[in-house]
From Swiss-Prot:
(2E)-4-hydroxy-3-methylbut-2-enyl diphosphate binds at residues 43, 76, 126, 166, 224-226, 269. Isopentenyl diphosphate binds at residues 43, 76, 126, 224-226, 269. Its EC number is 1.17.7.4. This is 4-hydroxy-3-methylbut-2-enyl diphosphate reductase. Transmembrane segments: none annotated. It comes from Tropheryma whipplei (strain TW08/27) (Whipple's bacillus).
Length: 313
């Protein structure tokens, strides 16, 4: 069989990531460096490194930022406590929280005010989960996995609703909800799907190429939830092997031994140049035929954060 690449589409940048990265670039143009960013603007080492070279400074907490400095909140969102701390320091805040994450924040606020206890399906410690749960810390409990759904101790069970992190495995989330419903039949669903369109689309594309691939390569960083999920989805849907890497030069040539078909995709925070670099490496290894496998068309564009909206150019 001739060596070939199955290139998943959609892949790479989603609308929220594109918006956040442009926000940092625009802030640097307008205000000049340094511009401070709380946490990584998106979870990709290449993107963060590129922005650092342009003058962005990434910090873990707002108390590391000089008073009055231009500060950007990452795409993953923040809690009200972080907003309060930023205001106390007089920071010039540009909020690059993804609008789809903000939607979940609003759901938390609305349900908690209505007396609901919220089971937030997600990964404890992830910045998005910390920001979301911070909007009602006494009314939110994080459920990390289907197995945890079987045993988690819920203090208030009369009015329950489940919400989720936006970058989870669709299938694993459905399994978690199924198990929660066995214990709490009255648990309410969110008003709309919390897992974002880009996460779902990228997983659907991987499901299409996985059973046809001897190896699936996911370009993405280790701390990128949606990239890690793509590896899991590939393995769960028929790929003989799957790996994640940040850069093409990390690819171990031994992985290509006896491999005829390589599936390629990338996480939602990955610029296309990194995929192109990988395709060049694969071409040199004999994988010159590239077939695009498209499962959806994405044309969503978010407006830039307040204060940066006059131009996206």
């Amino acid at each position: 069989m001739a060596k070939r690449v199955l290139l998943a589409s959609p892949r790479g940048y989603c609308a929220g990531v594109d918006r956040a990265v442009i926000a940092v670039e625009k802030a640097l143009e307008r205000h000049g460096p340094p511009v401070y960013v709380r946490k990584q603007i998106v979870h990709n080492v290449h993107v963060v490194g590129s922005l650092e070279k342009k003058g962005a400074i990434f910090v873990d907490q707002v108390d590391q930022i000089p008073p009055g400095a231009v500060t950007i909140f990452s795409a993953h969102g923040v809690s009200p406590a972080v907003v309060h701390s930023a205001n106390e320091r007089g920071l010039q805040v540009i909020d690059a929280t993804c609008p789809l994450v903000t939607k979940v924040h609003r759901e938390v606020i609305r349900f908690s005010k209505a007396g609901y206890f919220i089971l937030l399906i997600g990964h404890s410690g992830h910045e998005e989960v910390e920001g979301t749960s911070g909007h009602a810390p006494d009314r939110v409990l994080v459920v990390n996995s289907p197995d945890e759904a079987d045993t988690i101790d819920v203090p208030h069970t009369d009015k329950l609703v489940w919400l989720s992190q936006t970058t989870l495995s669709v299938d694993e989330t459905l399994e978690t909800v199924k198990r929660l419903r066995l214990r709490f039949p009255h648990i309410q669903d969110p008003p709309s799907d919390d897992i974002c369109y880009a996460t779902q689309n990228r997983q659907a594309a991987v499901k299409k190429i996985a059973p046809l691939s001897d190896l699936v390569i996911v370009v993405g960083s280790a701390n990128s939830s949606n990239s890690v999920r793509l590896v899991e989805v590939a393995l769960e849907n028929g790929a003989k092997a799957a790996v994640r890497l940040d850069y093409a030069d990390e690819l171990d040539p031994a992985l290509l031994d006896k491999v005829d078909v390589v599936g390629v995709t990338s996480g939602a925070s990955v610029p296309e140049i990194l995929v192109r670099d990988l395709l060049e490496v694969l071409a040199r290894a004999g994988y010159t035929k590239v077939e695009s496998v498209q499962t959806a068309v994405e044309d969503l564009v978010f407006s830039l954060p307040k204060g940066l909206r006059e131009s996206r150019k």
